[in-house]
Amino acid sequence: MISPSSPFERWQALAAGLYMSIVGYSVLAGIPVISTAWSSLLSFSEPQVGRVAGADLGGLSFGAVLAALFVAKMNRRVLVVLSVLGAVATNIACTLYQSYEATLLLRFLAGTASGVFTGIAVATLGARVNSARAFNYLVFAFAFVQAAERYWLPRMSMNTIYLVFAISYLPALFILSWVPATGIRSGNAVAPSTEAELGAGDSFSSARIEAVAGQEFSERAGVVAVPTVDTSVVPKSVPWLCLSAMALTYVNIGAYWTYIELASADAALDADWVSNVLVWVSFFALIGCLVATLISDRFGLAKPLLLTLLIHALIVAILVPGMDKTRFFACVYEFNFLWIFNDV
């Protein structure tokens, strides 16, 4: 349970978490146009583009795992500084070494630094009492950043794109004090009077003490208490199955955004029209965010999510017979809508 005086509840922590999350996810947001840049400006083949994109996004995942391992053991501000230095250095190195082999390695390292950076940002947002609202802010802002990237990046050289990514990390150093240095200790969840009231020799367990303290805080802060769930009835394999399903889902999403613009070029669709569609489709994510919130409030999470994943697969399947303007338009709009729907 989070103390009302928690540093994570300050607006500065919210602002830092949102900015860092947006910067950390910037490559993912712009991957369709970045993939095209690797192909057209660096003359990478389509398989090479896929491997470079996979290295970048794979590094993002690896970095997030590293952040999860060290976030409770190290000062978070130190992790932010290290990740900023790594991201800036590797993006600048990409402007100097542009062979396929060098780019493959450097994009993995850049993705890893970005993953640590983003992991700290997400942990900062997730530690708030109303973390759902914080992530809704993130999804809302992400739509505008995604649109901006898809509009401006195609107008830049490859080196300029790398430099923009490098520079975007630097403001985090100026707002470093806004990032809480440590997480919330579990001991802080117990109200000072709770243990004394129960008595030192009381038969209540520590879990019961935390439950009572949590109820007291909920009543004081106006937070609706959530009934305790008996996790012993959930098989240990279920969380791992859920994580595996999430990983596979995002591998497919990453692959889609990596190749969709390249596929449109192979289908001889007008490049300017495709670019405009990719820009405006970003704003469709806002509708996805709103609809997902309304549906989840009414019908819960599991059934809408399962149905959405099935529709997601069917939407991509409409491109199997071939790609024309109508199919491309319908596919990218529905895909982006459902992608954000799944996130929410």
Region annotations inferred by a language model:
Residues 43, 96-101, 300, 321-323:
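Helix-breaking motifs and short loop linkers at transmembrane-helix boundaries and internal kinks
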Residues 31-32, 237-279:
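Extracytoplasmic gate region of multi-pass secondary transporters
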Residues 106-140:
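Cytoplasmic helix-loop-helix junction between adjacent transmembrane helices
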Residues 51-60, 275-285, 335:
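Transmembrane alpha-helical segments of major facilitator superfamily
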Residues 63-76, 288-301:
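Helix-to-loop junctions at the C-terminal end of transmembrane segments
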Residues 78-92, 303-318:
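Structural signature of the two symmetry-related core transmembrane helices
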Residues 137-184:
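Helix-loop-helix hairpin linking two adjacent transmembrane segments in secondary transporters
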Residues 101-110, 326-335:
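Paired small-residue
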